[in-house]
Amino acid sequence: MTYRPLLNDLVDMAAGRAPVDLVVRNARIVDVFSQRIVEAPLAIGGGRFLGFFEAEAHATLDAEGRYLLPGLIDGHVHIESSLVSPAQFARLVLARGTTAVIADPHEIANVCGLAGLRYMLDATRDLPLDVRLALPSCVPATPFENAGAVLDAAALATLMDDPRVAGLGEMMNFPGVLAGDADVLDKIALALDRGKTVDGHSPGLAGRDLATYAAARIATDHECTTVDEMHERIALGMYVLLREGSAARDMARLAPGITPGNARRCVFCTDDRQPADILRDGHIDNHLRIAVSHGVDPVTAVTIATLNAAECFGLRDRGAVAPGRVADFVLVDDLTGFAVRKVYAAGRLVARDGAVVVDLPDHADPAVRDTVNIRPLDDTAFRLPLPTGLARVIGLQPHSLLTDALERDVPRDASGCFTPGDGLVKLAVVERHKATGNVGVGIIEGYGLRGGAVATTVAHDSHNIVVAGDNDADMLVAVRELERTGGGITLCAGGRVLASLPLPVAGLMSDRPATEVSATFAQMLSIAHETLHISRDIEPFMTLSFLTLPVIPALKLTDRGLFDVRTFSFTTVGV
């Protein structure tokens, strides 16, 4: 932005030569700089905080003794994973006190390339939610799958100078970093040369490998699942983004690792969170509740949720209640439950008691529709011949993106093909961008599905079709339903569709209101658990969507076959 026209107004209002826009009285203001509570009037004008003083004002607000926090910031989120459009996502999180997010749109980029990134910039431009993009670093995530696009450093350079671009998105290709891969380092330099942040992704890295990764000036990691991992990264100068999503829930394990000495290197993030979870449990406000319940000082927790995130990603005019900063703030009842009563963005009321009170413009773009393009399949598409009964199996872990690499004696039919049973379910990935006909087939344990199939076009990160089932016929019905709807999530049994949630925007997002999407999703969850018997320890759809991501250990499945993340190479299902 250009500050000069704004400065005259700010200085005149702060100096008393002009009325301010708003004075907030009777608030307990959380001062994240001095780690204290301030009780003083707060003057706001021109969408900015002016200072702690009384002033002639166009309007006043009685906070009635509530706590006033800076607007909450999500340090790493994939908006597409909310299954709704950016405007509908904003409606969900603004109501919970989140006023800024660092969004990595690598989901839509893997489907639509630069057109998807431009859509995300255009769709968020006029929202009261401040959306900064971290340009996807790994499209495709690896060279071991087929995505809808390839984005090299030259492609990213066309958008990196946009002021709403915070930097480079999570560098999932940590083997490429360690090996000094030229394309990887070119992308990192693209952000660093502009003084922007490089976001990280380094599950399981430790010791010299982690130090090498950090030496590449990668600033963050949101893949920590233990306190030891968290502390090792902080000791290397990295920020740790403590994640509480829908499938990956790490806060309870990591919050005890927050100390007075390391708290300023912590940030909160959701990564992937679905509408029902946001509506029920909240967004970054949920992180605050969890942190405090695990003994973190409330003001420290607020600092993590605001100032730390702002400083990590270069949002220099946000993250604190201080003169000159954007007047994003939240009124909450107390510093334990953090019940959000009012939310202001740039000095304007945007949400009250859980409801957004301003119009949020939606954005339509034909470039991100009609994205399901598959070669016709027949009833042999999902056959899995095995040389013996011993097979490599993907073992699911409750509430985690990690999987186990298992070996199991599996049932086979007379022709030597795997037949689901004994707690084992068939998994397939169908390429859906260029109609290559690629179909990868594997076996999972711990999903619990019986009597049907589940399929979705949300399949990180290349977003091919992933389908799980205990019979090939229902798996085929499910894939054809996704082709019909232009993408989405579907449940099938007995040769018919039980329920579907169409996601026509890139096969990732709905064009319907968030409440409608949430209601449909809740109905489908019920069917998944009760009719198809999927384990209640598993989030059926998001868990399925991560079984295709070949950068999180240990075994994953792509459209090209079974992939061992530990060795970064393909392996066979048969042992």
From Swiss-Prot:
InterPro entries: Adenine_deam, Adenine_deam_C, Amidohydro-rel, Metal-dep_hydrolase_composite, Metal_Hydrolase
Reaction equation(s) it catalyzes: adenine + H2O + H(+) = hypoxanthine + NH4(+)
BP GO annotations: adenine catabolic process
Family statement: Belongs to the metallo-dependent hydrolases superfamily. Adenine deaminase family.
NCBIfam families: ade
Cofactor(s) listed in the protein's UniProt record: Mn(2+)
Name under which the protein is recorded: Adenine deaminase
Any one GO molecular-function label of the UniProt entry: adenine deaminase activity
Hydrolase among keywords: yes
Keyword annotations from UniProtKB, A to Z: Hydrolase, Manganese
Enzyme Commission no: 3.5.4.2
KW Transmembrane helix (keyword) present: no
